[in-house]
Amino acid sequence: MLIEHERGFVLHVRAWRETSLLVEVLTEQHGRVGLLARGVHGPRKQALRAALQPLQLIQFSAVQRGELAQLRQAEALDTAPRLVGDTMLAGFYISELLLRLAPRNDPVPELYACYTQARTHLAADLPLAWGLRRFERDVLEGLGFAFDLQHDSDGQPIDPAARYRLDPEEGALRVLSERLAQDRRETVTGAALLALGEDVMPAAEDMPGLRRSMRSVLLHHLGGRGLKSWEMLEDLARRR
């Protein structure tokens, strides 16, 4: 199959043999596409190497043969965001998450839209944690894994003052045990869930619980195998 003049975001790049690269690209029309870029070294290929960088929006043409497509041409369509510190790790995170969850050669336009919005959010230096929670929510929705953020697993309206545990299959489970309700490591406030559903940034004190709860749900859909970016973020937090 011939892929011509397709737009996509570079998610991941790694060396293959001595002169080639394996590139994962997220596209709107073809989903996640694996590209084999041959012979990318040398001064005449400098522009191509510069285009094949994570977070970069490119336009490319390729021939699909089996699992990988043979790259014919690629060019950068803009300047990738220059991220440093926490935002750089966040950029790594959004790319790694979709590298793991976006299906190969199966278009999910919602995921392309999620990545576009998250990339813009990172470049604009907006509140980082909130941008990532929105991204996670939208990715789950795009993959068909969304849960009700207005009602709990029993169909009752979520109580802002109560605490809940997010279950990947059942949604928000209200915590009735006083001991568990006080354990903020495993639960999230109803106020935070309602805010997430209404696309309003929760209170600062509710953000850690929301992060942990969303990570637990994502871990389920990742098959129980975490992300390298999570390890990097935790290591950075311990060093501070």
From Swiss-Prot:
SUPFAM superfamilies the record matches: ArfGap/RecO-like zinc finger (SSF57863), Nucleic acid-binding proteins (SSF50249)
Described function: Involved in DNA repair and RecF pathway recombination.
GO CC list: bacterial nucleoid
A Pfam family that the UniProt record links to this protein: RecO_N
Keyword field: DNA damage, DNA recombination, DNA repair
Stated family: Belongs to the RecO family.
Name of the featured protein: DNA repair protein RecO
The species this protein was found in: Xanthomonas oryzae pv. oryzae (strain KACC10331 / KXO85)
Origin: domain of life: Bacteria
Entry keyword ATP-binding: no
InterPro entries: ARFGAP/RecO, DNA_rep/recomb_RecO_N, NA-bd_OB-fold, RecO, RecO_C
GO biological-process terms attached to the record: DNA recombination; double-strand break repair
